[in-house]
Structure formats: structure tokens, C-alpha cells
A protein has these predicted regions:
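N-terminal auxiliary "cap/dimerization" subdomain that precedes the catalytic jelly-roll/cupin core
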Residues: 158-183
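Helix-start/capping segments and mature chain N-termini
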Residues: 1-157, 163
Length: 183
């Protein structure tokens, strides 16, 4: 019972995390669109980091079963929310956009860093707005962000190569991030 807890505890683990193989940070990674939707905000607000990642884990399993390491999760309205462990950004015609927080995603620290610091420093216009899957498929570039994911280029599973989504914008943005150290 939560009210019987006399003293709260905090556990901190400090370690280097590398979510993906080193090559994916430079060459990009394929992503699929998960069949499982993101939980509605009214049921479990994903902006609260409560460690309840069951929905994300099930979508991640779906991706891994397809031979892919990451999946884009849609909300129950069919709009892009986030990936299983990362925020998603789209570059189209020189504008960087990302789903707004109403889409039902965790408001990531690295996401905010791109919005507040990186994009403006490089002269990009940034928009927080709704995205359809077609927006992702029609993007000039797609990248994922996260504290552990850093900045990772992405491509549709159907795309021929991740290079199709890695243009000059990604290289410029990537210069603001240090990739995970290779041991």
C-alpha cells in the first residue's frame, strides 16, 4: 500500500548506455510502424516517466520480431506519437518538425535540447505539430533522439537505404552530439 511507505527511496545507476549497434549512429537504422497504438493519455499519461513501459516493450518486441530495432508508435487517432524509446523528428524542405506533446509522448530532454538549442543555432525553423505516417514516409530526413539514443538517423523499413534519410541537415545536427564511446 503506497500510504504505508514510511520513507521513499531513490536509486541512481550511472553508466554508459548504448542502445543500438555503433554503426546505426552513423549509418542509420530501419524503423517500422508498430501495429500496437500508444496508450491514450487519458489512461496513462506517457509524459510521466513512471517506469510503466509495457506498451512500449510490446511494440519493441513487434519491431524485433520483424528484424528491426525500433518502431514508430501511433496514438489511437493514428497520429505519430513517438518511437518505443525515442522521440522522432522529421526534416522536410529545411523545416524540422516533431510531434507535439498532445500526441501522447514522453517530453524528452534531448528532444527539448534539439528544439531550444540545436535547431535555432543551425538556423532551422522548428515546428511542434501533428504528423501522419505519410509525413514520415515523405520526409527528406528522419532522426530519433533520446538520452541513451543520442541522435540516430532513421529510415523506413521499405526505404532502400538509410542514406536516403541522411542529408546535410543530419550531419549538422549530429555535430552537437557526442556518439556513444566505442570500447
Amino acid at each position: 500500500h503506497p500510504f504505508k511507505c514510511e520513507r521513499s527511496s531513490v536509486i541512481i545507476i550511472a553508466d554508459v548506455i548504448s542502445l543500438y549497434p555503433d554503426s546505426m549512429y552513423t549509418e542509420g537504422m530501419s524503423v517500422i510502424v508498430a501495429k500496437r497504438p500508444r496508450l491514450p493519455v487519458a489512461c496513462l499519461d506517457p509524459r510521466i516517466k513512471s517506469l510503466n513501459y509495457l506498451n512500449n516493450i510490446l511494440a519493441k518486441i513487434e519491431a524485433i520480431d520483424a528484424g528491426i530495432l525500433e518502431a514508430i508508435m501511433l496514438n489511437t487517432e493514428g497520429l505519430v506519437a513517438e518511437c518505443t524509446g525515442d522521440n522522432i523528428f522529421i526534416i522536410k524542405d529545411g523545416v524540422i518538425s516533431t510531434p507535439d506533446t498532445e500526441a501522447g509522448m514522453l517530453h524528452g530532454i534531448t528532444r527539448q535540447y534539439v528544439i531550444d538549442t540545436v535547431a535555432p543555432a543551425l538556423g532551422y525553423t522548428i515546428e511542434e505539430r501533428s504528423h501522419q505516417v505519410e509525413d514520415v514516409k515523405g520526409a527528406d530526413e528522419v532522426f530519433l533522439t533520446g538520452t541513451a539514443a543520442h541522435l540516430t538517423p532513421a529510415a523506413q523499413q521499405e526505404a532502400t537505404t538509410a542514406e536516403a534519410f541522411r542529408q546535410n541537415g543530419f550531419v549538422k545536427l549530429g555535430s552537437y552530439f557526442t556518439p556513444p564511446e566505442v570500447e
